Curated annotation (Swiss-Prot):
Its EC number is 1.4.1.21. One of its GO terms (biological process) is NAD biosynthetic process. The active site is at residue 221. The keyword Protease does not apply. It is an enzyme of class 1 (oxidoreductase). PANTHER family: ASPARTATE DEHYDROGENASE DOMAIN-CONTAINING PROTEIN (PTHR31873:SF6), L-ASPARTATE DEHYDROGENASE-RELATED (PTHR31873). Keywords: NAD, NADP, Oxidoreductase, Pyridine nucleotide biosynthesis. It catalyses: L-aspartate + NADP(+) + H2O = oxaloacetate + NH4(+) + NADPH + H(+); L-aspartate + NAD(+) + H2O = oxaloacetate + NH4(+) + NADH + H(+). This is L-aspartate dehydrogenase. It holds the Pfam family Asp_DH_C. Belongs to the L-aspartate dehydrogenase family. The iminoaspartate product is unstable in aqueous solution and can decompose to oxaloacetate and ammonia.
């Protein structure tokens, strides 16, 4: 049985932990780590499995599968700690992998230590189709992210440019550019663009549009892909996570589904 250690006790980390704790994922929740030890301890105590709250190094030693659900800034430390000890790792903060050096480092480590790196689809649909389409030529990939004010409030791009989202009373596009830039400007909002870039045409050629839309209550991701295979258009209207409006509930469900697939012998999907 997999012994899973979760790094990060935020909205997504907690949803994943609950899914393991209630048996949705057939594994053991071994340990939790968060910079806020008090929060992690309180949350762990609320679970029936009573996982231990451990420092990162001890969590990795105690587990045989590690989940990063913290932040882009934590990915390097968590992934290297896990892979160096031959632990497979699932990365939720996929935007960190826009760093080519980091991506190549962890790929090499995974090969050397005979383990795997898992990147869930997140809050978008159609990733399997894009992965299949990438076998031939893809001409263009565009993702348009529409979020209510609270879903984008505080993003570095908004703060640096003094954008007042509260003054917007109609849908307003505030950013259009390559995924490589979008991921840095909106690190808590467009991780889906990173997953899409990795399976498609890369971070520089994937176009990201960000729209503040005060008329909606959901996080909407629209994807358009054109290539030799034909055309793909998907729209997903996501309910925000209960404790973090910047995160979609589907992102947590995607992580849970990935863990279930890791634990099960039957693998479905491209």
């Amino acid at each position: 049985m997999f012994r899973i250690g979760i790094v990060g006790a935020g909205a997504i980390g907690k949803e994943i932990a609950r899914a393991i704790d209630n048996g949705t994922v057939p594994a053991k929740l071994e340990a939790i780590y968060d910079r806020d030890t008090a929060e992690a301890t309180s949350f762990a105590a609320s679970l029936k499995s009573k996982p231990r709250v451990l420092p990162l190094e001890e969590l990795v030693e105690a587990s045989n599968f590690v989940v990063e659900a913290a932040a882009q800034s934590a990915v390097r430390e968590v992934a290297i700690a896990a892979l160096s000890r031959s632990r497979s790792v699932m990365i939720m903060s996929v935007g960190a992998l826009a760093d080519k050096e980091l991506l190549e480092t962890i790929r090499t480590m995974a090969k050397e230590h005979c383990c795997s790196i898992y990147l869930p689809s997140g809050a978008i649909g159609g990733l399997d189709a894009v992965k299949a389409a990438s076998i031939c030529k893809i001409d263009s990939v565009t993702i348009t992210t529409r979020k209510p004010r609270d879903g984008l409030r505080g993003a570095p791009f908004i703060v640096r440019n003094n954008i007042d989202v509260d003054s917007m009373d109609e849908p307003t596009e505030i950013f259009s550019g390559p995924a490589a830039v979008a991921i840095k400007e909106f690190p808590a909002n467009v991780n889906v663009a990173a997953s899409l870039s990795l399976v498609g045409i890369g971070f520089e050629r994937t176009l990201v549009r960000v729209v503040v839309d005060p008329t909606i209550k959901r996080n909407i991701h629209e994807i358009s892909v054109r290539g030799e295979f034909g055309e793909l258009h998907t729209v997903v209207e996501n309910v925000p996570a209960r404790s973090n409006p910047k995160t979609s509930f589907l992102a947590a469900l995607s992580a849970i589904a990935t863990l279930r697939q890791v634990c099960e012998p039957l693998k479905i999907g491209t």
